[in-house]
Amino acid sequence: MPFDKPIVHVIDDDEAVRQALAFQLGSAGIEVRTYESAVAFLQVAPTVHTGCIITDVRMPELSGIDLLRRLRELKHPVPVIVITAHGDIPLAVEAMRLGAVDFLEKPFEDEVLLASVRSALDQGDRDQKRQTERSNIEARLAALSNRERDVLKGLVAGLANKQIAYDLGISPRTIETYRANLMIKMQAASLSDLVRMALIAGVLDSNES
């Protein structure tokens, strides 16, 4: 069952730490799931699309650093906060290099934890919205004809209708028709909105002609 609500996924081999973090976050009204190992979390990782992850660095079987590497390979979208021992700066730096959004040194205050989690949840929410928008735009692009895509590329490149018509060997009036169809199919409110969506989807990066 997919996790669609913003949930904090706590990963730590120490049960006392898991319970303490769950209590701290739960007291702030944040929903929590706990896992005794990175391996246990990876089993459900494909169903986790929102929220954030809090993981200890030093764990048996699979460390927090190893988990970050796995998540990076999977292109997993959920932000990760890493918990490190006091003074364990090299591991913290490695974690950030692998994509962690923050690290917390033990011991840390409740306020520090909550601030970090809320920031990660906000980032995750923004990332999810961007991904959803991109997916929707790509679906609309897939419904365009090859000619409509050619016209769209011309518009995104800033070409005038007459120039696009000349390049494609058709009349400017036909370009106007294609342009009107593009606005409808792409659900664009304006030409600038159409161009914005095309840029998000990387239309100019396409090698199609």
Question: Whereabouts are the PLM-identified features?
Answer:
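Acidic, metal-coordinating helix/loop segments flanking the phosphotransfer/catalytic sites
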Residues: 34-52
